[in-house]
Amino acid sequence: MADVEVEQLTKRFGDFVAVDALSFGVQHGEVFGLLGPNGAGKSTLIRMLTTLVPPTSGQARIGGFDVVRQANDVRQRIGVIPQAMTSDMDLSARENMSIFAKLYGIPREKRKRMIPALLKAVDLEQWADKPVKMFSGGMRRRLEIARGLVHEPKIFFLDEPTTGLDPVSRVAVWEMLVRLKRERDLTILLTTHYMDEADKLCDRIAIIDHGKLVALDSPLKLKASIPGRNILEVSFSEVPANWVDTLRQLPEVAEVKPHDNVFRIASHNGPRTTVALMEAAREAGITIASLSVQSTTLDDVFVHYTGHQLRDALQSAPAYSSSFMYDRK
């Protein structure tokens, strides 16, 4: 049985469909990523799976328990790390941990053993009695993760865990999550709009756009599922008539997608296509304004399945706050 089972899960807000009939499963021990822009439905999905928002229709089970009918059982088995950091800035790391442990009814003697061990696990042992307002963003995020583990959950939900962190802190959080998953036998479900994060961390990725599931597989298989081994991104001084047809006839070209004045060309052999492209531009009397060649990435996968780039979707997405407090009642 999967740790997370989702069947035709839907959430509507009036006429707006935030999550549209999603179905998938997350196996025990897996790091499962939900990849998509802000407004794609990722945070709404997390809120339903963690019992904070009821679905309009469909079903979801966490550890075998229904998120609506058996919400209390679900809450005892999950850890939730929201996007917004909620630790009390005036209290110490130890005090923040202690308050959360008390909310879960953890006995005093167990708290005394557990809290130092968790702070050590997230490399905050030396900062245990320092006020959180002295912490960097990465340190605060590590504290939030430790706090989410006080009741020893086996299924861990993280909503955009590295948003707002600098690159060094992001990598530190990645490494810590991988280690904690291994040491504590966790199943992790996280949302992200960072392609590199999904690629590095996740065993499988579900790409979500406009509330719909558009692709699901391992990062390697997703990248292998689209045409070509290389992506050429090229723009020209001008675009002649039928230029797309000319590009499609170049050697080794698998696919051409125009985007304004930029053309994304999927190629089985990037160098050979590049040489032919330069010759075609010369013969047409036009200038190549910019050209880049790279191996296939998850960004290319996103473009292939949705028709637009993730960064474009992020810019056009409506503002939405995914912060929430966890209520055990």
Regions found by a protein language model. Give the residues of each.
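ABC transporter nucleotide-binding domains
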Residues: A2-V6, K11-A215
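Preference for bulky hydrophobic residues occupying beta-strand positions
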Residues: K11, F24, E233-F236, I265, ...
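Residues at or immediately flanking beta-strands
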Residues: Q59, S92, P131, I231, ...
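Non-catalytic alpha-helical coupling and interface elements of nucleotide-dependent molecular machines
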Residues: G105, P227, I231, V303, ...
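ABC transporter nucleotide-binding domain
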Residues: E175-H268
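C-terminal coupling/interaction segments
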Residues: N269-K329
